[in-house]
């Protein structure tokens, strides 16, 4: 759900956090641009949930090994008729972001963009101009 009528006033980019290596996780530091727009705890919870989902996607387990073996045995044609564990979790991420946008972010004039659309490099948050509320600028 996107606030269609309001013009874009800016964008905030939440960068990847490489402090624990190259696994996909994002910084939970609250950006100053979102002050008075969304609750700090709600923002941090959203990013933590996304980080947990990406950790689940990258987790190696029996299913991942089985997928790899089946891929080798079928010259990777198995993936034409089967979703990988990673793809299933990415769908969960997309659904979670859509729910967060509808329930929390869009009513506040914000829009989360799925990190997969930005190559898993950043979480983009679009800020729409306040509708009838002074932004203090």
From Swiss-Prot:
PTM summary: Palmitoylated on Cys-69 and Cys-72; which is required for Golgi localization and interaction with GOLGA3.
Coiled coil: none
Protease as UniProt keyword: no
Parts of the chain that traverse the membrane: none
Record-level GO BP terms: Golgi to plasma membrane protein transport; Golgi to plasma membrane transport; peptidyl-L-cysteine S-palmitoylation; protein stabilization
Cited InterPro entries: Golgin_A_7/ERF4 (IPR019383), Ras_palmitoyltransferase (IPR051371)
Top-rank taxon: Eukaryota
Record-linked Pfam families: Erf4 (PF10256)
Membership in a protein family: Belongs to the ERF4 family.
Protein name from the UniProt record: Golgin subfamily A member 7
Taxonomic placement: Eukaryota, Metazoa, Chordata, Craniata, Vertebrata
């Amino acid at each position: 759900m996107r606030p269609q009528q309001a013009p874009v006033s800016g964008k905030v980019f939440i960068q990847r956090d490489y402090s624990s290596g190259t696994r996909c996780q994002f910084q939970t530091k609250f950006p100053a641009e979102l002050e008075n727009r969304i609750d700090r705890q709600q923002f941090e919870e959203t990013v933590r949930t996304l980080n947990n989902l990406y950790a689940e996607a990258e987790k190696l387990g029996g299913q991942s090994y089985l997928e790899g073996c089946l891929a080798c045995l079928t010259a990777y044609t198995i993936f034409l008729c089967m979703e990988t564990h990673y793809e299933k979790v990415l769908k969960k991420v997309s659904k979670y972001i859509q729910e967060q946008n509808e329930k929390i972010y869009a009513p506040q004039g914000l829009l989360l963009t799925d990190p997969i659309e930005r190559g898993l490099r950043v979480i983009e948050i679009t800020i729409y101009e306040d509708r009838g509320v002074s932004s203090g600028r």
